[in-house]
Amino acid sequence: MDNVRKIVLLTIMLVSNSIVFSQNGETAKKLLDEVSIKMGAYTNMQIVFSTSLINEEAGINEGDEPPHNGKIALQGEKYNLEYLGNTFIFDSKKLYVINHDEKEITVNEDDLNEDDGFIYPSKLLTFYKEGYNYKMGKLINMNGRKIQFIELIPIDSNSEIIKVDLGIDQKTKHIYKLIQTGANGAKTTLTINSLKSDQQLSEMTF
């Protein structure tokens, strides 16, 4: 997935930029920690989301394809994710994948990972804690909400992900949008359309 990085003067500029980036990074990390504490304090969450893809290299431009909708229930390490025609149920020990089209169930001994370069909704609260540098991005008004973006840059220069722009609702401290730019320039956008916390969940959910 390619994108979206007189000697004395140059030295001064580099030093100045590194100081600003460090301060900027501390501010960004503080906000991320606030989000993690706020959302992590809920007993559970039910999230409805949509994803969209732009990949000009593959001829997929903005608006060419309808968004894919999904929903997820999260409780601690457990989750029930419905996405792309599959249901993923993780009971904190095993992952059950139900393929409704093929009418088959597979069982994995571990959780979903990002080996395919995609950040799954189940990882929203934890994916950034390791392997990224942070800096504050733009503050944008979206649908009447002030969304503060944080730019996350992978430390691994060989990562399939070039950067992740994480949009946080300034008022609620909830994650609203995630825009992931791949090494091939493809952009995957995940938007949280609704979030409910501390709901009464059935025992059969996980």
Report residues per predicted region.
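N-terminal leader/targeting segments and the immediate start of mature chains
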Residues: 18-64, 205
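Flexible, surface-exposed loop/linker segments and immediately adjacent secondary-structure boundaries
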Residues: 110-145
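Gly/Pro-enriched, hydrophobic low-complexity segments
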Residues: 132-135, 139-206
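Bacterial Sec-dependent N-terminal signal peptides
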Residues: 1-28
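Beta-turn initiation residues at beta-strand->coil junctions
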Residues: 51, 99-100, 179-182
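A short, surface-exposed beta-strand/turn
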Residues: 68-69, 73-75, 89-91, 164-177
